Curated annotation (Swiss-Prot):
One of its GO terms (molecular function) is proton-transporting ATP synthase activity, rotational mechanism. It is found in: Cell inner membrane. PANTHER family: ATP SYNTHASE DELTA CHAIN. F-type ATPases have 2 components, F(1) - the catalytic core - and F(0) - the membrane proton channel. F(1) has five subunits: alpha(3), beta(3), gamma(1), delta(1), epsilon(1). F(0) has three main subunits: a(1), b(2) and c(10-14). The alpha and beta chains form an alternating ring which encloses part of the gamma chain. F(1) is attached to F(0) by a central stalk formed by the gamma and epsilon chains, while a peripheral stalk is formed by the delta and b chains. This is ATP synthase subunit delta. Keywords: ATP synthesis, Cell inner membrane, Cell membrane, CF(1), Hydrogen ion transport, Ion transport, Membrane, Transport. Belongs to the ATPase delta chain family. The keyword Ribosomal protein does not apply. One of its GO terms (cellular component) is proton-transporting ATP synthase complex. F(1)F(0) ATP synthase produces ATP from ADP in the presence of a proton or sodium gradient. F-type ATPases consist of two structural domains, F(1) containing the extramembraneous catalytic core and F(0) containing the membrane proton channel, linked together by a central stalk and a peripheral stalk. During catalysis, ATP synthesis in the catalytic domain of F(1) is coupled via a rotary mechanism of the central stalk subunits to proton translocation. Disulfide bonds: none annotated. It holds the Pfam family OSCP. It is a peripheral membrane protein.
Amino acid sequence: MNDSGVSKIYASALLGAVNSPEEVEQELGDLVQLLFKEEKIRNFFLSPTVSIEEKENILEKNLRGKILDVTLNFLGVLLNKGRFINLPEIQKRFTVELDKKKGRVRAQIKSYPSLEPAQITKLGSILSEKFKSEFILEVSEDKTLLGGFVVQFNDLKIEKSIASQLGEIKKAMLEKKLPVGAVYEN
C-alpha cells in the first residue's frame, strides 16, 4: 500500500476515535510544525538508531498535559508501527476527511492585487450559495495574474484574471480569424 493510502487509513481511524476533531486537527498541525520543520528534531524522531522508547519518553515528557491524550497516544502508535514519517501526510488527510464530514470545502484564491476583506467575504458567500457548502478560503497574492483572481477547489478552477480574459479574446480572434493590427492603404 502506498503512503497516501496508509495516511488515509490512519487519518480515518483517528477521526473515528476522537470526540473533539477540530482540537485534534489543530494539534496535528501544530505537531507537524514542531516535529518536522526543525531539522534536528525531525532527524531525532526519524532516526532508526534512537529507540522507540526514547522517542516516546521525549514526547511524554514534553507533551503530556499540553495536548489531548488521544493525540499523544496516536503519536505513540505511529512510532510503534514505523509510520511516524507519515505524520505530515496523515495531518493533511485528517483535515480532508474532517472537511468532508463537516461539509466544508477548502478553496485557494490567488489574486492580484490583494482582495479586500469585504471582497473575500462576498466571494465566500457567493461560493457557499452556489455550491451549497461551507467554504474555507485560503487567500494569497499572485503577481503573475496581472489583475483579477483565480479560485481553485476540488477539481474546479474559476478564472477571473486579466490573463485568462486576454487568452479568451485571443482564442476568439483565432477562431474567427479576425484581423489583428492596423490596415494601411496607400
